[in-house]
Design a protein with these regions (language model features):
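Short glycine/serine/threonine-rich phosphate/pyrophosphate-binding segments
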Residues: 1, 66, 91-98, 120
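Glycine-rich, small/polar surface segments that engage phosphate groups of diverse ligands
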Residues: 1-76
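Short, glycine/polar-rich helix-capping loops at beta-to-alpha or helix-loop-helix junctions
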Residues: 111-124
Length: 160
């Protein structure tokens, strides 16, 4: 969820809207369009698979809870998208099912893990393994790693 926040709004840079969108907003409705064009920022599309409680609950009851993330990757993911799987051990089965679905859909897979990388580390196109064994230490090191990823993405797409 934290990563989505950094990608969907300005992280450290201002993300001005394209002129074409500013114009379209103002044409759609002058007063609200002007306000929107001043307050909205450019966004990098991102979805946290952990946030869809009703879907996850229904899918768990009707099918199999371990496949909830895979269900969402199947529904939201497209060829060329990137799936970021996070698992401290690299062996979380729900994340692995989602990664397999991502691969089948032609998505790139980044694994963010700890310990020895686990199954996800071996399966991912890009594996980032933080050098710790304890879960809390792995989680603490994941924070600067995903902040660095967000900074790099923001620089790539919003440095003008």
């Amino acid at each position: 969820d934290h990563i989505v926040g950094e990608l969907m709004k300005g992280f450290v840079k201002k993300r001005p809207l394209p002129d074409s969108l500013v114009q379209a907003l103002k044409e759609a409705e002058p007063q609200r369009g002007a306000e929107l064009s001043q307050k909205l920022q450019g966004a990098l599309p991102a979805i946290a698979l952990t946030n869809h409680v009703a879907l996850s609950s229904a899918f768990a009851n009707d099918v199999d809870g371990i496949l909830s993330y895979a269900r969402q990757v199947n529904g939201y993911g497209n060829r060329g998208d990137v799936f970021l799987g996070i698992s401290t051990s690299g062996n979380a089965e729900n994340v692995m099912y989602a990664a397999v679905t991502a691969r089948a859909k032609g998505m790139k897979i980044i694994g963010l893990t700890g310990r020895d990388g686990g199954k996800l580390g071996a399966f991912a196109d890009i594996s980032i393994v933080v050098p710790k064994q304890e879960t809390y230490q792995i989680q603490e090191l994941h924070l600067p790693v995903y902040h660095a990823l967000c900074l790099m993405l923001e620089k790539r797409f919003y440095d003008r």
